[in-house]
C-alpha cells in the first residue's frame, strides 16, 4: 500500500487498525518474518494517537493467512494510520 512496505487494515467499525510489516533485522535470514501491530482509534474523530494494544512477530506465511482471514471478515485495506516508533506516534484518520 505504500513505499515503506507496511500494509494496513481497518475494521468495519473504523475503530481497530492493524499494521503488517516485514522484520528486516531478524537473525535467521532463511525465514521471513513480519511484525503485526494492533491498535484502536482514539478520540471521536481520530484526533488523538491510536492506542497500541499488541505487537507480535510471525512467519510471513502466518501473516498472509491472517491478512486474508481479516479481509474475509470485513476488514478493509487502508492507508498508514500512525508513524514513528511506539512511544511517539501520530494518527491520521482522514487517510
List the model feature ranges, each with a label.
Residues 1-73, 77-95:
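Terminus-proximal functional modules
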Amino acid at each position: 500500500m505504500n513505499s515503506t512496505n507496511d500494509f494496513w487494515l481497518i475494521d468495519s467499525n473504523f475503530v481497530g487498525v492493524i499494521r503488517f510489516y516485514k522484520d528486516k533485522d531478524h537473525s535467521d535470514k532463511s525465514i521471513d518474518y513480519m511484525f503485526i501491530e494492533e491498535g484502536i482509534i482514539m478520540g471521536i474523530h481520530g484526533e488523538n494517537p491510536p492506542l497500541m494494544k499488541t505487537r507480535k512477530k510471525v512467519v510471513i506465511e502466518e501473516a498472509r493467512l491472517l491478512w486474508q482471514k481479516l479481509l474475509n471478515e470485513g476488514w478493509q485495506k487502508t492507508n498508514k494510520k500512525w508513524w514513528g516508533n511506539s512511544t511517539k506516534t501520530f494518527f491520521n484518520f482522514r487517510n
